[in-house]
């Protein structure tokens, strides 16, 4: 599709680690103080091929392991149907996960049975907590059926003109 030719799909696992540190050190800490056993909902806008979504899933899952009784759901949206399909498959090359801490690789990645492929897949326990859907911010009326505790919109809004950023 044309959108795949013109959109930027730059993304990495644990891109800009300080954002994830803020999530655990501040946002999630405050969340557990003010919410008893509930579902923490995150929206990753412009999720590309899913690295940010699955990074969020790992970080949140790690946090909630020491705060029992909490669940989480993550919605990833993107304009590209191809990127969304890649996100749902959750298959990545070894080099895509090279910078990920070893203990997280062991816990959250499954190696391909075919070793020559040099690919991994996100474990089902995380994949089931992550949903993906198409969204175009340029549509005059886009509606989200859900409310969210946190919205990550950091890798998409920078590509819009100031007036469009304001509308988004």
Where are the model-predicted features located?
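Conserved AdoMet
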Residues: 1-43
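N-terminal "domain-start" segment that seeds a small globular fold
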Residues: 14-29, 54, 127-138
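Conserved class I S-adenosyl-L-methionine
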Residues: 37-56, 72-75
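Short strand->helix junction
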Residues: 9-13, 49, 158-159
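Short, well-ordered amphipathic alpha-helices
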Residues: 22-31, 53-64, 88
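A short glycine-rich, Lys/Arg-flanked "PGG" loop and its adjoining helix->strand segment in the class I
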Residues: 166-168
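Extended basic-aromatic, gly/pro-enriched interface segments that bind polyanionic ligands
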Residues: 66, 70-152, 156-164
């Amino acid at each position: 599709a044309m959108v795949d030719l013109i959109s930027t799909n730059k993304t990495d696992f644990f891109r800009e680690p300080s954002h994830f540190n803020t999530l655990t050190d501040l946002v999630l800490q405050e969340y557990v103080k003010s919410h008893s056993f509930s579902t923490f909902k995150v929206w990753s806008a412009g999720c590309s091929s899913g690295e940010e979504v699955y990074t969020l899933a790992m970080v949140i899952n790690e946090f909630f392991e020491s705060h029992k009784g909490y669940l989480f759901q993550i919605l990833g949206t993107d304009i590209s149907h191809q990127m969304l399909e890649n996100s749902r498959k959750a298959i990545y090359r070894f080099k895509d996960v090279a910078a990920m801490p070893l203990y997280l690789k062991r816990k959250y990645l499954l190696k391909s049975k075919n070793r020559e492929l040099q690919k991994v897949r996100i474990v089902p326990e995380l994949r089931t907590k992550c949903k993906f859907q198409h969204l175009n911010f340029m549509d005059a009326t886009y509606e989200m059926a859900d409310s969210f505790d946190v919205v990550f919109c950091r890798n998409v809004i920078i590509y819009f003109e100031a007036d469009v950023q304001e509308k988004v």
